[in-house]
A protein has these predicted regions:
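Conserved catalytic core of the tyrosine transesterase superfamily
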Residues: 1-411
Length: 411
C-alpha cells in the first residue's frame, strides 16, 4: 500500500505523479485545514497518488473522475492488488469534494444535464437570488420540489408538467401527507405552493396552481403534547459530559434552547461573529431572514464561552457549533435535534425534539405571569395564534385563567 516513504530513517511525503500532481499540495493543505488527523492525511494523499498513476496508465484525464463507472474500475483494481483500506468510493469523498470546490471537475456525469436536475438548479437559484430565501428554506423547499418532480416521468418531464391539473396536485398532497405529521405536512404544502408559483412563472405549467394546494389541518387539541417539566430540563442539562468536547458543545446548545427558546435551525445558524460579548447580545437569524438581537443570560454566555475555549476545534469554519471530528463542518438543524435526543437518552428520559424545549420556555414564562403577547415577542412570533398554541400544553396555567363558578348558580 502507498504510504509515506522512509528515506534515511526519516519519513518523506508521498509524491503524486500523473494528472493529479498539480493538486497534491493544495489537497494536503485542504485536509490539514479541515482538521484531519496526520494518519488520515497520509492515507488520503497515498490514495490520491495511486489514483493519479492509474489515470495516467489508463490514458484518462482528471475529468474521468466524474464517471462513477471509472471510479468503480479503479477500486476494483485496487482491491485486486491486495489493498484492504480505502477500497470503496466513499474513500474519495474528500478528494472529489476538493476538486469540485476548485472547479477542477464538475458534478457526476450521470447526474448532469437531466431536465429535473436543471429545473431544480434553476429553482434553487430563484429562491436565493429573486426571493432572498434563507439557506434552510432553500434546502427544505428544494427537497419538496425534488419529491414532486420524482412522481413525474423523467423522460418526458416538460410534457408531464404542462398536463398537470388541480386534481393531480390534490392527490399528491393527500398521498404524501397521509403518513406525515400535520406540522411537517403544513411546511410541505407551503413549499409546494412556492414550487408551483415558480413553475408557472417559468412557463412549465400553463395555469396558476398554487391555490389548488389543499390546506392541512394542524390543530390537535385532544392530543396536545405533554409539556417538558423543569425537572426534565435540569436532568438533560446535567446529563451532558462537560469534561468532553461533545459534552461542552451539547451543553451550550441545550442552554440556548432551554433559556432563549431558539429554534433548532436558529441555533445551527449562529456564527462566531453573531455574539457581541461586550454588549451581551446574540444576533439570531429567524424565519423570513429576520435578524434579532437577544440579550444573553450570564449562564448561557458562560456555557458558550466554555465550549469555544475548551471544546470547539480549531478550524476555518465561522459557524459556532461544528462537528467534533474532521472535517469540522457546521451542525445542521437535524444535528441539533440529535444533541437533544442524546441528552434525553443519557438522562433516562423518553426522547423529544428541540421544539418541545421551546414549548417549555413558553410554558415557564406563562407560569411566571408573562402575557401571551410578551411571550410572542420573546419567541419572535408574528402570529398570536402560534403563541396561543404553546399555551395549550400548560393546563395548570390555563386553569388559573378560568373564572370561578358564580355562587348564585348553585341549587
Amino acid at each position: 500500500m502507498e504510504s509515506e516513504r522512509t528515506v534515511g530513517g526519516r519519513r518523506s511525503p508521498t509524491v503524486v505523479t500523473g494528472p493529479l500532481a498539480d493538486y497534491a499540495a493544495g489537497f494536503r493543505q485542504f485536509l490539514i485545514a479541515q482538521g484531519y488527523a496526520r494518519r488520515t492525511i497520509t492515507v488520503q494523499v497515498s490514495l490520491m497518488a495511486h489514483l493519479s498513476r492509474w489515470l495516467q496508465a489508463e490514458g484518462l484525464t482528471v475529468d474521468a473522475l466524474r464517471s462513477s463507472a471509472d471510479i468503480d474500475r479503479f477500486f476494483a483494481e485496487r482491491r485486486a492488488r491486495g489493498h484492504s483500506s480505502a477500497v470503496s468510493a466513499n474513500a474519495l469523498v474528500a478528494l472529489l469534494g476538493f476538486l469540485r470546490d476548485r472547479q477542477v471537475i464538475g458534478g457526476p456525469a450521470a447526474d448532469a444535464g437531466t431536465p429535473a436536475r436543471r429545473l431544480l438548479a434553476d429553482y434553487r437559484r430563484y429562491l436565493r437570488e429573486e426571493r432572498g430565501s434563507a439557506a434552510a428554506t432553500v434546502r427544505g423547499f428544494s427537497a419538496c420540489a425534488a419529491m414532486f418532480l420524482r412522481v413525474l416521468p423523467a423522460e418526458r418531464l416538460e410534457e408531464a408538467l404542462a398536463a398537470i391539473s388541480a386534481a393531480d396536485v390534490t392527490r399528491f398532497v393527500a398521498g404524501w401527507a397521509a403518513s406525515r405529521s400535520p406540522a411537517y405536512s403544513k411546511s410541505m404544502v407551503s413549499a409546494l405552493r412556492s414550487v408551483l408559483r415558480f413553475l408557472h412563472s417559468c412557463g412549465y405549467i400553463p395555469r396558476p396552481l398554487a391555490s389548488a394546494v389543499p390546506a392541512v389541518p394542524g390543530w390537535r387539541v385532544a392530543g396536545r403534547p405533554r409539556a417538558v417539566t423543569g425537572r426534565e430540563v435540569t436532568a438533560i442539562l446535567a446529563a451532558c459530559d462537560r469534561g468532553s468536547a461533545r459534552g461542552r458543545r451539547d451543553y451550550a446548545i441545550l442552554m440556548l434552547l432551554t433559556r432563549l427558546g431558539l429554534r433548532a435551525g436558529e441555533v445551527a445558524g449562529i456564527g462566531l461573529s453573531d455574539i457581541d460579548w461586550r454588549q451581551g447580545l446574540l444576533m439570531v437569524r429567524g424565519k423570513g431572514n429576520s435578524l434579532d438581537g437577544l440579550p444573553v443570560p450570564v449562564d448561557v454566555g458562560e456555557a458558550v464561552a466554555d465550549y469555544i475555549r475548551h471544546g470547539r476545534p480549531r478550524c476555518k469554519s465561522r459557524v459556532l457549533f461544528v462537528s467534533v471530528r474532521a472535517p469540522f463542518a457546521g451542525l445542521s438543524a437535524a444535528s441539533i435535534g440529535s444533541a437533544v435526543r442524546r441528552a434525553c437518552e443519557a438522562a433516562g428520559l423518553d426522547g423529544f425534539g428541540p421544539h418541545r424545549l421551546r414549548h417549555a420556555v413558553a410554558c415557564q414564562l406563562l407560569r411566571e405571569g408573562a402575557s401571551l403577547n410578551e411571550i410572542g415577542q420573546l419567541l419572535r412570533q408574528r402570529d398570536p395564534r402560534t403563541t396561543a398554541r404553546y399555551a395549550i400544553v400548560d393546563a395548570g396555567a390555563l386553569a388559573g385563567l378560568a373564572r370561578p363558578w358564580p355562587q348564585g348558580a348553585e341549587r
